[in-house]
Amino acid sequence: MKQSFATAQPRVSLIGNPSDIYGGFGLGFPIWNWQAKVFLDTSISTTEEIPLLQATREVFSQHHTVKQKFGLRFISDIPLQAGLGGSSALVMAALRAMGKAHGFQWTWRSLADATLTVEQEHLGIIAGPMDRWIQAQEEFLWM
C-alpha cells in the first residue's frame, strides 16, 4: 500500500436543498475556491483521527480489504458551519485517498453512496444525495 492524498470540493445548492431528502429536485455546483484534502500515511497513528474520519475508515474497511495499518490526516479551508457540504467533502476526500492507496477506483455513484452512508448511518447526519452527487461528479448538477 502506498501513501496517497485526495481532495474534494464544497458545494452550493441553488434550488432544492433539502428537498432532495424527500425525492425533490435540486440544482447545485461545486465551489473550486476551497477544498478538503486528506492524506493517508502508513507512518502515523489512527488514535488521533476525528470521528468523521474514523467512521469513514470503518465504512471503507467493511467493503474493501485493508492491507496494512495507516492513519488519515486532513487539511481543509472550507468555512465551518457555512452550509457548503464541508463534512461530506472531508469524507469523500478520505474515501478517495483510501481507494487510491488500495488500488480501488470509485464510480461517482458508489463514492457518493459511501459518503452518504458514513454521514447518515455512522454519524447520524440527516442528508439527501444531492451534496454528494455534486461533489462526486465535480460539476454543475440538476437532479
Which residue ranges define each predicted feature?
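ATP-binding N-lobe of GHMP and related small-molecule kinases
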Residues: 1-88, 96-108, 138-140
